[in-house]
C-alpha cells in the first residue's frame, strides 16, 4: 500500500500551528475540500491531550463551527487526531491557512472562555458523555491561543521540509 500524505509529514520537525494537511477534489464535480491540521502540541516532545479535554474541545468546536454565521455552511468535520496532538478541521472549498486563521482564533477563544454545560454531553446525545474535562479544555485552548496563534508566522502556517 502507498504511504498516506499525513504520514509523510516529518513529525520530528512539526510544531504547533495551523497547516493545510491536504486538498481533495470530488472526481465527479471537481469541488474542493480542504483538511486543516490544527496542531496543539509538539509531536513526540510534549504530552498529548487526555481524552476528556480532547472530547470536550471536540463537542465545543463542532457546536461553535456548525453555528458560525459565516462558515457554518462550509464545515464538513471537526474532530481530534488519533494521536491526540491536535484536531482536523475539514471545510468545503480551497482555503489557505491564512484564510482560516481568523476562524481558528474565534473557535479557540470560544473554547477558552466557555462556561456551563458542555453541548452534547448527555447520555442520549453522546456515546461517552462522561469523558469530559471543561477546565482542561479551557486551559488548552488558552495556551494554543497565547503561545501559538497570537503571533503565528509562516513556519507555523505551512509544513516545513527537512
Predicted regions and their residues:
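Active-site-adjacent, His/Asp/Glu-enriched structural segments that form or flank metal-binding
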Residues: 78-150
